[in-house]
């Protein structure tokens, strides 16, 4: 099995329900994918049982399905959400404080950053909703110092299913597959209404409700990070560091933050005994069309994981292409050439990656808040120094 000390146990609670208690299946269980309504039902049960969790409606899809955002932090931080949001709004637009660095330092010292995680924008990449349910439970109930520090220094915000229309279609298709073992079944033609993989190329056009809902949430909360979860290559690729060409409107401070977070992720997960974790790769950092780039274009930090997945909850023997387990300077601990891979393995990697990222972020929260302010200030100054900033037609 592929596991880590962060996911090889589940903290007990007499009052707060686990996903298994509400849905009848542990996170990452074989042969089970929850519909959107079940995912949301779990998060609302979690919020009803814990003062450290709040659920917010953030809009609806083209077909009328609800999208949610779930905030998790210490009870005192959740009680002060509005005041914290007002402080972050001033850091997000330094004109409101006359570009005063001393005032910004005061706001940084008083504020708590927001780390926004999104899952299941690509409907055939099925693991993130269950991983995020269990992650939320851990963050809400675990008394371990590692988790308590995250909970007291970061507001974790989660949208467990971004493409809600496509998720339900995918679950229906997967359930047909379970009811007809051994029979071929087609991939989804469309996920949303009417869009498939390119729902993650909409951050410029903003033509989809899911894009507008996530953008409104990120900007409305004045979050510092937007971390989008995907599935493809083995075993976890933090593509945040990326490769050239770099978009000229990306602040060099952000490039440094990508490096900080990405390489720390690789180091920490390698120390925890998880092979196949790497960054850099060949993902370019040019196009602002990806959902995560809503953060990069609003002075935050865009992040994305690609975790190994099976396009469903089947447990499958996977033989890797030699290129996938080649040892390189950026992949010194490559994945195994052949594995029996389950959705639980996928969930262990996603949760471990997110927890190590949240841990690093919580330990450097003041730094990232100050960077958030500086990037915002520099974005105001850049048109005067480097222009043009826009074209009017």
Per-range role (PLM):
Residues 1-393:
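Structured catalytic-domain cores with a bias toward divalent-metal coordination
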